[in-house]
């Protein structure tokens, strides 16, 4: 009988895409690997990215459904780029959790199919990196604007995490206090102090950090349609508010990594120099959270244009920052990302830093 229609349609479709094989040979064109970009800016004149967030649990970025095999390869790509620090952004968000927490399961959270925290600790150990744990986010702060709700759940979570992973893995290197704020948020100073103190007490003084945003003109609701807003914070107001926050938290928070994507590229130096001055004043490390996704696009969120990332990292170097981390490698810079342009960003980055 005649072959089914699909069997006939498949080679026709492949032909139309220019991918049909002739005698088993792939006819797709291949890039000439001997060609490099001709950079007209100085190579590597920027602070290199040495840390990345791991976006588990995601807030507003689609999941890639990786298993341990894919994560293992991603850690190898990170290592090749010079990353020595991986930070789980939050160990749970509302009812989704990354590890089988007895406390959170009792509270009605959903059972995960794998223990991501155990896997991240093992992979960090395997590739000579330090793993930092992001605290649980109940979602109540986002709903109410009051940070103090987050303290209660994390009392139990911090103890669980230390017993299950921190005391067991040498790769467990620190804590990320995951509440994101930008200005004088209700309960923030007290909450950061309380959670930071508990993290340090349980772990024998391991370091802690926060990653707030700057309330700049691109600090708009990710679910809304606008890319910018009228009422952006002034440098003076930013300095005043963060001076007060650092004054209140510096004993229990070792580093601050401001998200760098909410201000314009010609404002970077002004804000960055204030951040560095304040961090120095309070004996804190000044990191930058170099966002590798693009806030200037109408699509939320895709990998950033290389020159934008370059300018942000150049500014961090000019202002004497201590470390650059990114949000986040696996979606926006990884050669195996669901987004094709992420691997190209990786290539441009490696080319710029002469790591090809």
Task: Report residues per predicted region.
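Substrate-binding cleft of secreted/luminal carbohydrate-active enzymes
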Residues: 86, 257-265, 284-356
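Aromatic-lined substrate-binding rim segments of carbohydrate-active enzymes
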Residues: 68-139, 188-209, 270-278
